[in-house]
């Protein structure tokens, strides 16, 4: 029989007929496409066209995954990201995406060029001079009174009663909106308004699911004595649990301006939750002097405008988060979801020539500037303009750097070294150094001198720069945070992207509560 090829319209009709034949329960209580964020918003680009790189090939480089490992033993290439390719000519959604992108502000074209003194700083031979570091003045540590507090009270710091009440209100509003559209649905017949006690019980069961993973969600309510976990059926019915998960909401859909409006916020569904977390994380605890900025990837394989593809990550597709964490404990102080290269990031006091990655760093660091913090970043963020600006606001930094960044000394970049050798040059407070172990490592620092230390490996003793040793020690904060969460991750597939991110946020609150 010859193969039959369907047009897009015919395929849509067939798929719609198949969808209508599904069971009523699965249709009504599934995570419907009402909250699907269409790919037509725009195609995000993680590779950061605003980065201060010398050539266009920078956007194609991949970032190294092992920040917590010794950088002298790993690839110094930085991790990039790329959107899932789509064809705007063959797909109407792609055509709408092109129109949407045309309405976005062309900030890259408006950005002024990098000043000459930052593109061509004067580099001189280093002379073991340590920069005049600013004093550390932050009032670090816990900012709340924990006397006589029970373990649950630490979680209540990040999930207080007023926030849970807000989530209940938005969840009930969304449930009523769905019921109004389908008054004869299963949801309309069985829905009762959710209370804060219901929400707490729901979150407790969600947390326990991460501790006791099962292949399918309905298995938590099975009556099979081999697989049965009695607390689930004793506390809530499976239908009620699915209703709560389906209607879980954090903002009112009626307040969304729509994707065609230039003022549309891609993170509208989660914006109240993100703002709340950044507020309570900063109020509850002030980190120690050593901090790090890196990114996490929340696995997600659905259709989403801000979904990223990062080959070096274990879960290559997902939603990217930038996190500022304390190096010693992994406490998450501030987070930011990547929204695309056309998102508006305007941290106060930022120089006009700063690119996207620099703006992200300044936005995360804004509450901690002028206090003497020591920042550690990898080569995705490190640049001469950023480090010089951070030093001017009393925040020295250290990080590996890509060889094609503007302003680096050519003599350091192209220097041929033998294993164990170090070469460096200095431009005022900024030190550029190259170290050869198994491979070349380029680094910039405004914290250290070119001081070296003897390090013993399994087979020999080698001399390493102190800057490299401390980078290896303090850079793994975000990896440490992810390591804490990895045994408790809820990796179950979900259609609705913001619900998967929201469950990650709830678990992040649990982790921070454990740390403090």
State where each predicted segment sits.
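N-terminal initiation segments
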Residues: 2-388, 394-405, 448, 490, ...
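An anionic, glycine-rich sequence signature occurring as long contiguous blocks
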Residues: 112-149, 396, 407-505, 512
């Amino acid at each position: 029989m010859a193969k039959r090829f369907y047009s897009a319209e015919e395929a849509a009709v067939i798929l719609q007929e198949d969808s209508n034949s599904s069971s009523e329960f699965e249709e009504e209580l599934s995570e419907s496409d009402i909250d699907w964020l269409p790919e037509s918003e725009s195609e995000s680009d993680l590779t950061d066209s605003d980065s201060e790189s010398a050539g266009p090939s920078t956007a194609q480089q991949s970032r190294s995954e092992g920040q917590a490992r010794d950088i002298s033993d790993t690839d110094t290439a930085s991790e990039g990201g790329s959107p899932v390719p789509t064809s705007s000519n063959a797909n109407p959604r792609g055509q709408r995406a092109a129109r949407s992108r045309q309405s976005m502000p062309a900030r890259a074209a408006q950005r002024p060029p990098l000043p000459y003194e930052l593109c061509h700083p004067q580099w001189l031979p280093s002379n073991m001079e340590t920069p005049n570091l600013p004093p550390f003045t932050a009032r670090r540590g816990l900012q709340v009174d924990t006397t006589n507090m029970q373990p649950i009270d630490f979680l209540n710091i990040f999930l207080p009663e007023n926030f849970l009440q807000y989530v209940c209100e938005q969840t009930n509003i969304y449930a009523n909106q769905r019921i109004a559209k389908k008054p004869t649905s299963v949801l309309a017949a069985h829905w009762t308004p959710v209370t804060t006690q219901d929400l707490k019980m729901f979150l407790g069961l969600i947390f326990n699911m991460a501790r006791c993973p099962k292949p399918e969600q309905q298995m938590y309510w099975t009556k099979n004595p081999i697989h049965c976990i009695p607390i689930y059926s004793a506390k809530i019915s499976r239908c009620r649990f699915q209703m709560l998960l389906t209607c879980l909401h954090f903002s009112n859909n009626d307040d969304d301006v729509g994707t065609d409006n230039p003022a549309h916020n891609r993170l509208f569904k989660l914006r109240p939750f993100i703002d709340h977390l950044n507020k309570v994380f900063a109020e509850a605890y002030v980190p120690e002097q050593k901090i790090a900025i890196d990114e996490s990837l929340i696995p997600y394989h659905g259709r989403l405008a801000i979904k990223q593809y990062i080959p070096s990550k274990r879960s290559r597709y997902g939603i990217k988060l930038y996190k500022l964490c304390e190096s010693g404990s992994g406490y998450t102080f501030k987070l930011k979801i990547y929204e695309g290269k056309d998102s508006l990031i305007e941290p106060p006091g930022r120089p006009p020539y700063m690119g996207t990655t620099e703006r992200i760093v300044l936005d995360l660091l804004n509450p901690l500037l002028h206090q003497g913090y020591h920042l550690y970043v990898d080569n995705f963020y490190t640049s001469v303009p950023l480090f010089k600006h951070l030093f001017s606001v009393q925040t020295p930094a250290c990080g590996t750097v890509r060889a094609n960044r503007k302003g680096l000394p050519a003599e350091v970049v192209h220097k041929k070294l033998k294993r164990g050798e170090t070469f460096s040059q200095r431009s005022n407070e900024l030190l550029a150094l190259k170290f050869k172990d198994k491979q070349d490592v380029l680094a910039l620092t405004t914290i250290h001198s070119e001081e070296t230390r003897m390090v013993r490996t399994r087979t020999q003793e080698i001399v390493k720069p102190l800057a490299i040793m401390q980078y290896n020690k303090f850079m793994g904060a975000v990896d440490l945070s992810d390591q804490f969460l990895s045994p408790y991750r809820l990796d179950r597939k979900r259609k609705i992207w913001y619900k998967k991110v929201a469950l990650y946020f709830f678990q992040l609150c649990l982790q921070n509560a454990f740390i403090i």
